Amino acid sequence: MNKPTPLVDQFQRRITYLRLSVTDRCDLRCTYCMPERMTFLPRREVLSLEELHQMALGFIDRGITKLRLTGGEPLVRRDMLELVHALGRKLGDGLEELTMTTNGTRLADFADDLYAAGMRRINVSLDTLDRGMFETLSRRDSLPQVLEGLAAAKAAGLKVKINTVALKGINEDQLSGLIAWAHGEGFDLTLIEVMPLGEVEGDRIDHYLPLIAVQDTLERDWTLVPSDHRSGGPARYFDVAETGGRLGLITPLTNNFCAGCNRIRVTATGQLYACLGGEERVDLRAALRSDEPERRLSEALDTAMRIKPERHHFAIDERGQSPALARHMSMTGG
Ligand code: SAM
Ligand code: SF4
């Protein structure tokens, strides 16, 4: 049999990083991510454990070396650990890194198992250390569980990066304190701009906070030294001289990072989105549920390489309006 060809798109970008959403469900309801009464998908529409596994193997065959499991909240999926263990067996055999983005509420139960399966680094999303604000933002009073989960992750030996969405008039005056706390714990921290994805209640644009402005404010408290660290993602990094820790800034709306894009995303229903900010997609579930799953999957990946757009189309116009893309971040996993 011929060796499978690597995934290279029409702009000669080599795709090596897959973000795979394993569920659209979540135990939190972050206001910028989903409405309180979110309608979740019927289970039959979501890929089964076997389908997720088979699909991931197909990607690894085609040169995906980094796989991030996300959601929704990946740790609310019941058979999640089985999947992590199965994929962990590919580490060193095509796969170089298996990682996860989680809200941390269930980490206390899972941290040791994740490490045992071969995971070494995880991203944990946390926007505030104030319990009341956490509850307002996520509509659940779960900060204590998240902090417990973080302690468990650290004790298990997992390297943690905190992801914080910067929100104007909400947590903007806590960002400096979050840096001090995270670096004190030995965690890196990355700030993210809120993105126009999916309809949510209230006006997300009211809370859009350009990180360029945040950087200026942070520089009053911290010495930010530009770093040439790269994570294979869109973040720019700084070393914080006072803490010795690392700060990342992800600015999808103010900065164009598409030229170096190495990633694709697949939703829990097996829709491959070639770009987080675009509508171009390929239905991998149809391929997986066909008579010839292996061949159809590989063809679908070739199609994805043909349609991956050169750049994203996010925009917030001069009136502060954004033509929100119809899908939620909990579908494509951020
Ligand atoms: N539930 C997990 C979590 O929260 O880490 C994984 C999925 S969540 C959709 C992934 C990341 O997307 C989180 O860091 C979250 O803060 C971020 N996110 C969700 N909606 C967003 C939006 N509209 N703009 C920017 N980031 C968003
Ligand atoms: Fe859930 Fe993550 Fe969305 Fe918050 S950001 S509602 S934790 S999926």
Give names to the regions the model predicted.
Residues 10-50:
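Canonical Radical SAM [4Fe-4S] cluster-binding loop centered on the CxxxCxxC motif
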Residues 28, 131-132, 256, 282:
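Glycine-centered loop/turn positions within well-structured domains
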Residues 24-26, 34-37, 126-128, 193, ...:
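Short, small-residue-rich loop/turn micro-motifs
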Residues 73:
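Conserved G/P- and acidic residue-centered "switch" motifs that form tight phosphate/ATP-binding loops
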Residues 46-69, 77-192:
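Radical SAM/AdoMet-radical enzyme domain recognition
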Residues 38-42, 130-137, 198-202, 283-284:
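A short acidic, helix-capping loop that chelates divalent metal ions and anchors anionic groups
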Residues 29, 33, 77, 132, ...:
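Residues that scaffold the ATP/ADP-binding catalytic core of kinase and kinase-like folds
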Residues 2-17, 180-184, 194-334:
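Auxiliary Fe-S-binding modules of radical SAM enzymes
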